[in-house]
Amino acid sequence: MAKIQFIQGVDEEAIPDVKLSRSQDGANGIAKFYFDKPTVFDVYQGEITGLYLIDEEGELSTRTVYAKFINGKPQSIEASYIMNNREEWERFIRFMERYAKQNDLSFTKAKN
């Protein structure tokens, strides 16, 4: 089961918008996640410590996570996951394929 967490042990229910970019040689890439009104803001079981992508292969994580506030209230979370080589890229894609299938999501290639 593929899941996303901001607080370890607390699954995020909001489905993110994910944008991927990759270097021309495929050696590295970045995934940017945007969560509008994530459910983690409704949970008071600790602080957000990172973005954790968890599946049967293990865990991918990043500490590059930012919350956006409007009028003093949390509204969204943005996170970036950097992939430094082809193996990390392929591992991330496997996670996203599982997460997408589980949540009935699709992948759309950007138009040039």
From Swiss-Prot:
Keywords: Cyanelle, Membrane, Photosynthesis, Photosystem II, Plastid, Thylakoid. InterPro entries: Psb28_c1_sf, PSII_Psb28_class-1. It is a peripheral membrane protein. Gene3D superfamilies: Photosystem II Psb28 (2.40.30.220). It is found in: Plastid, Cyanelle thylakoid membrane. GO terms for cellular component: cyanelle thylakoid membrane; photosystem II. One of its GO terms (biological process) is photosynthesis. It comes from the Eukaryota. NCBIfam families: PS_II_psb28. This is Photosystem II reaction center Psb28 protein. It comes from Cyanophora paradoxa. The gene is psb28.
